Amino acid sequence: MEFRQLKYFIAVAEAGNMAAAAKRLHVSQPPITRQMQALEADLGVVLLERSHRGIELTAAGHAFLEDARRILELAGRSGDRSRAAARGDVGELSVAYFGTPIYRSLPLLLRAFLTSTPTATVSLTHMTKDEQVEGLLAGTIHVGFSRFFPRHPGIEIVNIAQEDLYLAVHRSQSGKFGKTCKLADLRAVELTLFPRGGRPSFADEVIGLFKHAGIEPRIARVVEDATAALALTMAGAASSIVPASVAAIRWPDIAFARIVGTRVKVPISCTFRKEKQPPILARFVEHVRRSAKD
C-alpha cells in the first residue's frame, strides 16, 4: 500500500467517478484505475462498485475511506513536525543552572525564547559548573548557565549580561550607606560571601574586585549560596554583596545599596557544546547570541 494509492482512492470516493478524480489530481485516468485495482488486490476486498450513478463505495470502501483520510492527515502532521524539529521549532531544551542567574536573567531569556518558539519546551536542572561541563560533553544537557565557567576546548562560553553589584544590609543599617556606595566605603564591613563551592566563584570575583582597588576585604564567612547569605542578613547577623538580579527581589528587612565604580560588575554566562548541536539547541544559541549583542 502506498500513500499515492490512498490519495487516489480518496479522490475517486469524493468525486464519484474516475474521470473527475483524474481531473482533480491532474493525471490521466488509466493510472488511477490501475492503482485502485492494485489497492483492492492488496487488501483482498472490493472497495469500489460501478453503478448507473458512477462509482459507489462498498461497506469496506466506506470503512477504508475513514482510515485513509486519517492516515494521510497523520502523515501530513508527522511531516510538519519533522520539518519543525529540523528547524528547532519543537522539542525539549534541557537547561542546567548554578547560582544566581536563576533569579532573573535566565527566566527572562527563556521567556523570550519560548515566546518566539511556542512549540518548544524547557526543562531546568540544578547542577554545579563542573557537572554542567560533564553533561554538555556527554549530551545529557543542552545548555548551562552560571558565572566563571572552567574553560574546556569542547564547549563555548558566551557572556549574556553584566550585572551591577549591591551591598545587602539589614534595614536597621541602611542609613550608613544610602542608595549607593563605593568599595572603599566597605573597608570596615564584615562580609558574608557566597557560594562556598564552584571555584572560581562569585565570591572569588568579589574578593578580586576589592584587591584590584587596593582594599583588603573583611570576610566573616563564605556560605553555600545567596539564600543563606541573605537569610543571615535578614537576621541582622551579616552583610553581603549580591548581583543586581538578587537585589531586584523584595527581601524582608534587607536594604540594598548599589556599589559604584569602574569594573564593579560581574558577568552571567551561557555555555554549550561547540559541535553536534541538535536543531533546538542551534536555534536557542542564535537567540542567546542576539540577546548578548543587545
From Swiss-Prot:
Q: Which GO terms describe its molecular function?
A: DNA binding; DNA-binding transcription factor activity
A family per Pfam: LysR_substrate
Which InterPro entries would you find in this protein's record?
LysR_subst-bd (IPR005119), Tscrpt_reg_HTH_LysR (IPR000847), WH-like_DNA-bd_sf (IPR036388), WH_DNA-bd_sf (IPR036390)
Which sections of the sequence are annotated for DNA binding? Answer: 18-37
> Which PROSITE patterns does the entry link to?
HTH_LYSR (PS50931)
GO CC terms in record? protein-DNA complex
Which keywords, in A-to-Z order, does the entry hold?
Activator, Aromatic hydrocarbons catabolism, DNA-binding, Plasmid, Transcription, Transcription regulation
Residue stretches making up the HTH lysR-type domain? 1-58
Q: Name one GO biological process term.
A: catabolic process
Q: Which Gene3D superfamilies match?
A: Periplasmic binding protein-like II (3.40.190.10), Winged helix-like DNA-binding domain superfamily/Winged helix DNA-binding domain (1.10.10.10)
Family label: Belongs to the LysR transcriptional regulatory family.
What PANTHER family has UniProt attached to this entry? HTH-TYPE TRANSCRIPTIONAL REGULATOR CYNR (PTHR30346:SF28), TRANSCRIPTIONAL DUAL REGULATOR HCAR-RELATED (PTHR30346)
Q: What does this protein do?
A: Involved in regulation of chlorinated catechol metabolism. Transcriptional activator of the tcbCDEF chlorocatechol oxidative operon. May bind 2-chloromuconate as an inducer.
Protein name, entry field? HTH-type transcriptional regulator TcbR
Originating species: Pseudomonas sp. (strain P51)
Q: Source organism lineage?
A: Bacteria, Pseudomonadati, Pseudomonadota, Gammaproteobacteria, Pseudomonadales
